[in-house]
Amino acid sequence: MVAVADWFLTGSDAMPAGQAKDPSEAFSNADAPLGSLVMLASPNGSYDTPFGTKVKTTRPSIANLKTAYVAWLERLKLNPQSRGVFYFCGHGISDGETQYLVADDFGEDEADIWNAVFQLTMTVQATLRKSKASLFYFIDACMELSEEIINQLEDPKALIGGSRRGALTTTDWAIVRATTANRLAYAPDGGVAHFTQALLSALRGHCGVEHPSGNGYSVDVARLRAAISEFLEFLQPEGMADRQKIGKTEGDGNWTVPLHVLSKRPSVMLELDVLPQGFRPIAQAFMEDTALVRDTKPLATGPVRFVREHGEWTYGTNSTDPTSFPEKIYNRKLLTNAAVRRLIKVD
């Protein structure tokens, strides 16, 4: 939660002049600058902003979530060109198809513990008829099957009411979920959840397409989803049996509305290793540009990573002992992904 807030607030819209981070590190969008940021966090406490103030946070109880959501919608209505971002990191469950998100006060009302759970898709469907803004939902929560919710007499409701009738006023929206149906979403002990870390890695300069104006590179849902998926794979331990994969993305439109705009070409993170791994002590990996300038790193301690702008690159592996194995080289490969892993087999 804090990491996402920091990404938004360390950009030029919130930081004092001269102290903002580059768009490869923080939010930037001249067409839709940051207008507001509201954080509900558990436990109750405060948030130390990047610009030096301390802000009290609100508990994400179901009542507070509803109040904050309605206020968010009212702000979005002020400008049809707005981009609305809803980020949720917490508990989630599923009835096998539909995802339900759990508020912080779940279980406190013993007469109806499920009134602190809300239905995500219906919340979004109601929202689409109340604003013209483009909407981005990033949901870092489990979709584990819950027989308890299946057996309830009444399904949990949306955060807001709405009618099925009438045309949608929002034509470009998406829900990007951390995991697939009936599965968990993981986080390291004391660390940032895998999906959130992958989302932030993607936003920090690793995906985008040239902006229609010719100035900068647009980061939209279409590019973000692919980049998040690639980083999510990188963040999970080797050999993990139940690997978390990005879930089904719901939405309408062509998913090309820029959430974020980079000032320079996106970069690829290329990870290289050698097989068999017994060669690691004498092996090294390299990456070379079109001017034949080569950057070499030893593989003695394991895989190495290079971060370079999207484009044509030559890469490969060789040995500090020329009698062990010949250089293996891949010439002028076009690299436009966010994160790429290559295991290079040598003889």
UniProtKB/Swiss-Prot annotation:
Pfam families: Peptidase_C14
Record keywords, A-Z: Plasmid
UniProt xrefs under SUPFAM superfamilies: Caspase-like
GO BP term, example: proteolysis
InterPro entries according to UniProt: Caspase-like_dom_sf, Pept_C14_caspase
Record's keyword annotation contains Chaperone: no
Record keyword Isomerase present: no
Domain of life: Bacteria
Listed GO MF terms: cysteine-type endopeptidase activity
Identification of the protein by name: Uncharacterized protein y4kE
Organism: Sinorhizobium fredii (strain NBRC 101917 / NGR234)
